[in-house]
Amino acid sequence: MGNVMEGKSVEELSSTECHQWYKKFMTECPSGQLTLYEFRQFFGLKNLSPSASQYVEQMFETFDFNKDGYIDFMEYVAALSLVLKGKVEQKLRWYFKLYDVDGNGCIDRDELLTIIQAIRAINPCSDTTMTAEEFTDTVFSKIDVNGDGELSLEEFIEGVQKDQMLLDTLTRSLDLTRIVRRLQNGEQDEEGADEAAEAAG
């Protein structure tokens, strides 16, 4: 299939990883096409708050590369390989798409705040010292170069890459490896997913 997204090719994954993911995908989704509802079930994301639900929908849409309303196996592998193995700039491009809820090519303060709150509901960071509001203010004060209250893709990528604290915090807050680990290990991490759902509810 070649480059599926932003220069990230499925060929970079080991055959063992692909086989594991394919087996899990086809077990959970025999049709080969994951709907939003199945996506929630697949990751154990149930009983979420409205903002967390919006984040999950946005994540689904960014994984649905061809915008047909389904995630097929190739989109699924491309998304997971990006999250697990993607280079920093590739991940930042994906984060930007995730934050840009209305799809206008810019992230405003409300969009960022909403997504940060939703991410924390699903995947709480134990070492977070700032509230979601404080973190949003920090991001804008540090990387909104022209002060227009919106972040362009260029401002976002350049600003975050220049600031190790922001890069570390964003990477941690979007660390889906716990959820992905559950996928790879079957249901062993169900308890963690249930805790995340309770924290969000």
Swiss-Prot record:
Task: Please list the residues that bind Ca(2+) 1.
Answer: D64, N66, D68, Y70, E75
Q: Impact of mutating Q184R?
A: In COD3; likely benign
Give the consequence of mutating P50L. Answer: In COD3; uncertain significance; some subjects may present a moderately severe cone-rod dystrophy; causes a decrease in the number of bound calcium ions from 3 to 2, without changing the activity profile
In what tissue types does this protein appear? In the retina, it is expressed in rod and cone photoreceptors.
What outcome is documented for mutating D144G in this protein? Answer: In COD3; results in impaired guanylate cyclase regulator activity leading to increased GUCY2D activity
Pfam families tied to this protein: EF-hand_1 (PF00036), EF-hand_7 (PF13499)
PROSITE patterns documented for this protein: EF_HAND_1, EF_HAND_2
Domain EF-hand: where? Answer: 31-49, 51-86, 87-122, 131-166
Q: Which amino acid positions bind Ca(2+) 3, per UniProt? A: D144, N146, D148, E150, E155
> What SUPFAM superfamilies does this protein map onto?
EF-hand
**Subcellular location field:** Membrane; Photoreceptor inner segment; Cell projection, Cilium, Photoreceptor outer segment
What happens after mutating Y99C? In COD3; results in impaired guanylate cyclase regulator activity; at high calcium ion concentrations the mutant protein stimulates GUCY2D activity while the wild-type inhibits it
- How would you describe this protein's topology in the membrane? Lipid-anchor
> Which superkingdom does the taxonomy of this entry point to?
Eukaryota
Q: Where is the lipid attached (N-myristoyl glycine)?
A: G2
Protein's job = Stimulates retinal guanylyl cyclase when free calcium ions concentration is low and inhibits guanylyl cyclase when free calcium ions concentration is elevated. This Ca(2+)-sensitive regulation of retinal guanylyl cyclase is a key event in recovery of the dark state of rod photoreceptors following light exposure. May be involved in cone photoreceptor light response and recovery of response in bright light.
- What's this protein's name? Guanylyl cyclase-activating protein 1
Origin species, per record, is: Homo sapiens (Human)
Organism phylogeny: Eukaryota, Metazoa, Chordata, Craniata, Vertebrata
Tell me the gene name: GUCA1A
